[in-house]
From Swiss-Prot:
Carbamoyl phosphate binds at residues 72-73, 122, 152, 155, 284-285. SUPFAM superfamilies: Aspartate/ornithine carbamoyltransferase. InterPro entries: Asp/Orn_carbamoyltranf_P-bd, Asp/Orn_carbamoylTrfase, Asp/Orn_carbamoylTrfase_sf, Asp_carbamoyltransf, Asp_carbamoyltransf_Asp/Orn-bd. Catalyzes the condensation of carbamoyl phosphate and aspartate to form carbamoyl aspartate and inorganic phosphate, the committed step in the de novo pyrimidine nucleotide biosynthesis pathway. It comes from Acinetobacter baylyi (strain ATCC 33305 / BD413 / ADP1). GO terms for molecular function: amino acid binding; aspartate carbamoyltransferase activity. Its EC number is 2.1.3.2. This is Aspartate carbamoyltransferase catalytic subunit. The keyword Ribonucleoprotein does not apply. GO terms for biological process: 'de novo' pyrimidine nucleobase biosynthetic process; 'de novo' UMP biosynthetic process; amino acid metabolic process. GO terms for cellular component: cytosol. L-aspartate binds at residues 100, 186, 243.
Length: 338
């Protein structure tokens, strides 16, 4: 499926009052909605930069449904739900009834009947979360934890929170470079959408033509393409390195990993071309010596581990807001409490 065809109308994600009830994609959401997610996430981090625990989802059940392998995303969603005092169930998809021929629809209906309040879904098929929210379980809050090459909205929002907290600059004043496998990366797609919605006017995509998607110009007027790394990172405030998505590539996009590192690897010489206070980010997992040098990943400008902490806060925000949006939609509460 061409990604341009995966349009998610805002009314699927928002309730009648305009509040989040599902979180499926960045595209179609307003700056106000994204800012509310960021502000709510920030409220879950105290003055000592520690995550708080709150009873906002006490008595609610969050089910993690990961049809693709994950370490960080699944674990941080579990940590986020527990900090909201929710019950968390991690469904073993490999041993579920879907492996015995049961349809996805029937599996989800059975899980919904077990009093699930929120499904956190990762799936290899683009549009899976949209399908579940629209056609299967509209009264369960659906959080997209990554669907194929399409979207990874919570990763984008934790990246936006990291950028906001670390640079302390308005998005309108930032130059952001995204380096690597843009073609196969749902993170790149979601980050570009979030940056544009929040007002960033200088988004630089640095990649060989073989790692750029068809219809790249559809990403917007504020996105510029650079095939040469040195030109792209010059005077940047933020650099986001992406790994090559080998599991989604049918044929090799480059001759070797060594060739990619030579042309697009982030090393000390290239980082020196950016602004002195430039921050370095990576969604993980990292391939050291391919897209990023260890001296950069572990260096003073790296905020990679901060992204992980911010990820828990953002996922707390999305879980809380979408649950309350669902309750508001069903007339069970009048106003959002966070």
């Amino acid at each position: 499926m061409h990604l341009a065809a995966l349009h998610t109308p805002s009314q699927i994600q928002l309730n009648q009052q305009g509040n989040l009830k599902h979180f499926l994609t960045i595209e179609g959401l307003s700056k106000e909605t994204l800012t509310k997610i960021l502000d709510t996430a920030q409220s879950f981090i105290n003055d000592q930069n520690q995550l708080i625990t709150t009873p906002l989802l006490e008595g609610r059940t969050v089910m993690n449904l990961f049809f693709e392998n994950s370490t960080r995303t699944r674990t941080t969603f579990e940590a986020a739900a527990k900090r909201l005092s929710a019950n968390v169930l991690n469904i073993d998809i490999a041993r579920s009834s879907t492996s015995k021929g049961e349809t996805l629809r029937d599996t989800l209906w059975n899980l919904e009947a077990m009093a699930a309040d929120i499904f956190v879904v990762r799936h290899s098929s683009s549009g899976a979360a949209h399908f579940i929210a629209k056609d299967v379980c509209p009264h369960v809050a659906i959080i997209n934890a990554g669907d194929g090459r399409h979207a990874h909205p919570t990763q984008a929002m934790l990246d936006m929170l990291t950028i906001r907290r670390e640079t302390k600059k308005p998005f309108e004043e930032l130059s952001v470079a995204i380096i690597g496998d843009i073609k196969h990366s749902r993170v790149a797609r979601s980050n570009i959408a979030a940056l544009q919605t929040l007002g960033c006017n200088d988004i630089r995509v640095i990649a060989p033509n073989t790692l750029l998607p068809v219809g790249f110009k559809e990403y917007g007027d504020h996105v510029r393409l650079f095939n040469k790394m040195d030109d792209g990172v010059k005077d940047c405030d933020v650099i986001i390195a992406l790994r090559i998505q080998n599991e989604r590539i049918d044929s090799p996009a480059l001759s070797s990993q060594a060739e990619f590192y030579r042309m697009y690897g982030l090393n000390q010489e290239r980082l020196a071309l950016a602004k002195p206070d430039c921050i370095v980010m990576h969604p993980g997992p990292m391939n050291r010596g391919v897209e990023i040098d260890s001296s950069i990943a572990d260096g003073p400008q790296s905020v990679i581990l901060h992204q992980v902490t911010n990820g828990i806060a953002v996922r707390m925000a999305v879980l809380a807001l979408s649950m309350q949006g669902q309750l508001q939609e069903q007339g069970l509460i009048e106003a959002i409490a966070v």
